[in-house]
Regions:
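Terminal alpha-helical segments
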Residues: 1-135
Length: 135
């Protein structure tokens, strides 16, 4: 049995980013399987975990998604650490995920799900580069 270690903030960021990659892979598999609502969900969470990985470096953490996204937009998008259009794309990801999870009458399309996965890939690529530069 190894002694308990809390790790570093870099360890937390790495762990969160691993979740990101797992969620993105799941989103792609679900898209291919025609499970568009589930693909939307995983695409959103892949981005959310990527954002969490960025914030883990500070370190800050929030209990609510809206607070996490608001902080990220204020401190990383509005300051142009990340491109401004990414904030809008993440906002759309959140809206589509919410519809997919909670709107009984929302019908997810292949096109929307493919767009969600594409945006997730874009965000994750930007976060990967950011984490590499700020490691």
């Amino acid at each position: 049995m190894q002694p308990y270690s809390e790790g570093t903030f870099d360890d937390v960021a790495k762990y969160k980013f691993e979740q990101t990659e797992d969620d993105l892979e799941a989103a792609k598999l679900l898209l291919e399987a025609g499970k568009y609502k589930a693909a939307n969900n995983r695409a959103y969470y892949s981005c959310f975990h990527a954002i969490d990985a960025v914030l883990a470096k500070e370190p800050v953490a929030f209990k609510k998604h809206k607070d996490t996204l608001s902080y990220f937009n204020k401190n990383y998008v509005h300051t142009e650490i990340f491109p401004r259009d990414i904030g809008r794309k993440i906002s759309r990801l959140e809206i589509i995920r919410h519809k997919s999870d909670y709107d009984t009458f929302y019908i997810a399309s292949k096109e929307d799900a493919a767009e969600q996965v594409s945006v997730a890939e874009e965000v994750i690529d930007l976060v990967r580069k950011y984490l590499e530069l700020n490691n």
